[in-house]
């Protein structure tokens, strides 16, 4: 059993990134978002809590506003939290109790390996949807909802086709136009994401997909990242013209067809939004629960400003 005093708070410059990344790679609950290169790209600042000799780690992604330090969830990083082998309830709670006191506000999402039943601190639960692709395509597609099957057929009957040559810039632009005002992504997050994409693309861990019409206009597009036998549906760029003809349905179906019968999980990255959950579930995806942590120790007058 560990104790909180075995968990060290390290500033960014003190982190041994080779040991850090080895921990993320070998953790049963490891996720791509936890790697140092991912955090370096997407977090405004990040420090860390480290157990022993990097037996378990937790990134502390932080920023500062009105003179107060706070922990926040970076863009395009759905789940962080504690990563490591042999995690117990006590270890996870020790990490949560080891935040430096300077962080007056905590609003972060942990990962599915951090669930603690009966804990008040970890009582806020969120939904992700995942689809195991370790079956033949014919078997997976049989589980599609009938409405999804009709939408997929409609898109291809209208002459749409799959493209894997769509540029990251076009996907980012579509994402900006359709989603930036909804999900709170900041303008500076996009060049950081592009840098991350290029890094992963060069190591064979990023792919782009699109559904285009007969004139090669992009109707639906997405970027997928790969790690830990997962394919992350990381960024979506859809055109309004594709919504009524099933372009997004056709895109996911094309990805599943290409990656079926592999030891791979398609990670949809959410969602608590009913319509998105319905969309993901329609492909046979199942719910994966993960906890979120909210702690507010801000002075009352700052809480008013935050509202």
Q: Language-model features: where?
A:
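Conserved acyl-donor/pantetheine-binding loop and adjacent beta-alpha core of acyl/acetyltransferases
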Residues: 64-79
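Non-catalytic accessory segments adjacent to catalytic cores
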Residues: 89-125
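Short, hydrophobic beta-strand segments that form beta-sheet elements in well-ordered domains
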Residues: 49-50, 104-110, 266-268
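Active-site/acyl-donor-binding loops of N-acyltransferases
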Residues: 2, 62-68, 113, 119-139, ...
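The substrate-binding groove and active-site-proximal loops of carbohydrate-active enzymes
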Residues: 78-86
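Aromatic (often tryptophan-rich) hydrophobic motifs at membrane interfaces
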Residues: 93-94, 198-199, 205-303
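A conserved beta-strand-loop-helix scaffold within acyl/acetyltransferase catalytic domains
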Residues: 2-53, 58-67, 110-243
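Short, high-confidence coil segments that cap the C-terminus of an alpha-helix
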Residues: 44-46, 101-103, 206, 261-263
């Amino acid at each position: 059993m560990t104790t909180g005093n075995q968990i060290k708070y390290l500033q960014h410059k003190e982190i041994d990134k080779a040991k850090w990344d080895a921990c993320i790679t070998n953790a049963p609950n490891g996720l791509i978002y936890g790697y140092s290169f991912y955090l370096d790209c997407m977090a405004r600042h990040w420090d860390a809590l480290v157990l022993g000799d990097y037996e378990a780690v937790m990134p502390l992604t932080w920023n500062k506003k009105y003179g107060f330090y706070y922990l926040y969830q970076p863009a395009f990083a759905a789940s962080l939290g504690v990563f490591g082998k042999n995690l117990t309830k006590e270890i996870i709670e020790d990490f949560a109790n080891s935040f430096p006191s300077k962080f007056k506000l905590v609003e972060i999402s942990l990962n599915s390996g951090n669930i603690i039943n009966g804990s008040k601190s970890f009582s806020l639960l969120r939904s992700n949807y995942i689809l195991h692709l370790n079956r033949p395509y014919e078997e997976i597609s049989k589980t599609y909802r009938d409405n999804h099957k009709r939408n997929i057929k409609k898109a291809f009957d209208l002459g749409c086709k799959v493209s894997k040559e769509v540029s990251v810039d076009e996907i980012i632009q579509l994402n900006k136009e359709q989603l930036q005002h909804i999900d709170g992504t900041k303008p500076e997050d996009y060049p950081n994401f592009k840098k991350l994409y290029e890094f992963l693309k060069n190591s064979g861990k990023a792919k782009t997909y699109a559904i285009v019409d007969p004139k090669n206009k992009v109707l639906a597009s997405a970027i997928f990242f790969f790690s830990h036998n997962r394919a992350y549906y990381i960024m979506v760029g859809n055109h309004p013209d594709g919504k009524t003809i099933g372009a997004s349905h056709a895109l996911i179906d094309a990805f599943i067809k290409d990656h079926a019968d592999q030891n791979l999980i398609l990670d949809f990255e959410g969602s608590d939004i009913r319509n998105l959950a319905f969309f993901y579930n329609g492909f046979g995806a199942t719910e994966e629960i993960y906890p979120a942590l909210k702690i507010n120790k801000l002075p009352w007058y700052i809480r008013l400003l935050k509202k």
